[in-house]
Design a protein with these regions (language model features):
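Membrane-interface "cap" regions at the ends of multi-pass membrane proteins
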Residues: 16-77, 91, 95, 106, ...
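Hydrophobic, membrane-embedded alpha-helices of multi-pass small-molecule transporters
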Residues: 45, 49-64, 69, 191-198, ...
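Hydrophobic transmembrane alpha-helices that form the core helical bundles
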Residues: 69, 82, 91-196, 201-204, ...
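TM-loop-TM module centered on a large, flexible mid-protein loop between adjacent transmembrane helices
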Residues: 112-123, 155-165, 246-250, 262-263, ...
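Hydrophobic alpha-helical segments and their helix-loop junctions in multi-pass secondary transporters
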Residues: 150-159, 219-248, 267, 310-316, ...
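Membrane-interface loop-to-helix entry segments
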Residues: 153, 187-241, 253, 271, ...
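C-terminal membrane-solvent junction of multi-pass transporters and transport-like membrane proteins
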Residues: 184-187, 199, 385-394, 431-481, ...
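Alpha-helical transmembrane segments of multipass membrane proteins
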Residues: 200-201, 229, 309-311, 355, ...
């Protein structure tokens, strides 16, 4: 990321178009120091903590609430194909993250990578656009976990699902009229906001304490997943799981558009294997820890997702998941699976475990994303206040509190309306740039110190690029989300140029 506090890269490389190799190599060193000296952060995260932080970020409430959406998109249990292809895409993308994270173990992840790969000029601009889109997408991602938590609590207390106020806010988007955004207020909204506030309070501690607590959260996440998987497998019906409707795999236009929509949702659920990259300055022996954490977390979560979805589809008719049998099954599918097998009390226990899982994801998201504004501020590419570090806990406390506050506000939104737009924005302004970037960096700086080199190069980034492009263009009405992403790009570009002109920076100065 552009500014992880490495001023020598920004200054010494201006006239070359690329950072000097000596500066880049320093990023790949497996420093043993307990403190990342130019950032004031403590390297206190080992491999177990890194894996648990990645996994609780990846799983969250997503697979428990999006399974019906994938089944609806693909019109049957062939939805498992979306999860399989999603796992392949996550693995290819994860290998790219592993190489970049091991070579540049700094706070902020993608911000640092884009800044370094594309040089002090284009890199500074692209990394600013990344920060700009993250200002929207990060709080929305965190808020989605909070809303999902409140949704599952509604299985225990249905009053939480009441809506006292709703409003449809049309957001103008050039060429596609409007992007609908639903604002909802009810008891569940307050619960979602409280979830975000509690997570921020628990993160307001040193990184060693935060990592230890993440291990405890990981145990609850595994409990929720295994409870549903084992229940489904013990009450499994092959006819339900593999009762494909006629023409399920006919290679028609409907099949490919449904697969694109399903793959988009699966990609959303696999997000998070890169969480440890945002915490690179706080990882011990990052050249080994970061790649291992990514590979292990992607592999374990892929297996869990496939088992979870197969077991659910083998116990509940897929027609129920598409809305033909009421909202309770769709909104609380994991709890319903266990309730039908072992009774109401067992279902309530699983609902609480899913709530635990949702909170774990919010905890991990807040932790990782709070390091990105901090990294940008260190590089003088964001508000300087976010560069502050708590004098005792050694954490970027201002960035953490800001992100938590904005996320609480976004809890009033019905976030399902924006999931597709958020995925498209991330693909255009982060994932595709990194897939291309890892190949650019191989060509421009072949001597760069790479503690981990992605396997089967260049196949993983090429497969990931193909998968992301398929998600972008295969779905009906895809132009709406793409134009929305372009609006984000245009507004970010205007702000960047205004700042650059005032500061006499590129393209208006040195």
């Amino acid at each position: 990321m552009e500014g992880c506090g490495i001023p020598h890269l920004a200054n010494n490389g201006r006239d070359m178009g690329h950072p000097p190799l000596s500066g880049i190599r320093s990023l790949g060193l497996r420093g043993k120091d307990p403190v990342a000296k130019d950032e004031g952060l403590v390297r206190g995260i080992g491999l177990p903590g890194a894996i648990s932080l990645n996994m609780i970020n990846m799983i969250g409430v997503g697979p428990f609430v999006t399974l019906p959406l994938i089944v609806l998109a693909m019109h049957g249990p062939q939805a498992i194909l979306g999860w399989l292809l999603g796992a392949l895409l996550a693995a290819c993308d994860g290998l790219v993250w592993a190489e970049l994270g091991a070579a540049m173990p700094r706070a902020g992840g993608s911000y640092e990578y884009l800044r370094t790969i594309y040089g002090p000029r284009a890199g500074r601009f692209l990394s600013f656009l990344y920060i700009w889109q993250l200002s929207f997408s990060a709080p929305l991602s965190i808020a989605s976990g909070c809303v999902g938590l409140a949704q599952y609590l509604g299985f225990l207390w249905p009053t939480l699902r009441k809506v006292y106020f709703s409003y449809q806010l049309p957001i103008p988007v050039p060429f596609v009229h409007t992007l609908p955004l639903s604002i909802l207020l009810g008891p569940g909204t307050l619960v979602a906001m409280l979830c975000c506030a509690v997570a921020a309070a628990l993160l307001y501690r040193n990184i060693q304490s935060v990592t230890r607590f993440s291990g405890l959260l990981w145990i609850g996440v595994m409990g929720a997943m295994l409870a549903v998987i084992l229940t489904g497998l013990l009450h499994f019906h092959w006819r339900l799981a593999f009762g494909f409707p006629p023409g399920a795999f006919a290679l028609s236009g409907e099949f490919f558009t449904g697969l694109g929509a399903g793959l988009l949702i699966a990609t959303y659920d696999y997000w998070g294997a890169y969480n440890i990259n945002f915490l690179g300055a706080e990882v011990r022996d990052p050249g080994r820890t970061i790649p291992r954490a990514i590979v292990w977390s992607v592999g374990l979560v892929a297996v869990l997702y496939l088992l979870l979805n197969t077991s659910v589809l083998g116990t509940i008719p897929w027609q129920e998941l598409t809305g033909q049998a009421g909202a309770n099954t769709r909104l609380s599918v994991a709890a319903v699976v266990v309730e039908r097998a072992y009774g109401r009390m067992a279902g309530e226990v699983v609902a609480l475990l899913v709530v635990w899982t949702a909170f774990s994801s919010v905890y991990a998201l807040l932790l990782g994303y709070s390091r990105v504004p901090y990294a940008a501020a260190l590089d003088n590419n964001y508000f300087r206040v976010f560069a502050r570090v708590h004098p005792r806990h050694r954490i970027p406390n201002i960035s953490l509190l800001m992100l938590a506050g904005v996320s609480m506000v976004f809890c009033v939104l019905q976030l399902a309306d924006l999931v597709a737009a958020l995925v498209v924005i991330r693909i255009l302004l982060q994932f595709l740039l990194q897939q291309v970037g890892v190949m650019v960096l191989r060509r421009t700086h072949p001597e760069m110190d790479r503690p981990f080199r992605l396997w089967f190069y260049p196949l993983p980034p090429l497969v990931a690029i193909a998968g992301f492009l398929y998600i972008l263009f295969s779905r009906p009405h895809f132009t709406r989300e793409i134009f929305f992403a372009l609006v984000v790009v245009m507004t970010g570009t205007i702000i960047y140029l205004w700042r650059a002109q005032r500061r006499r920076e590129w393209p208006f100065g040195a």
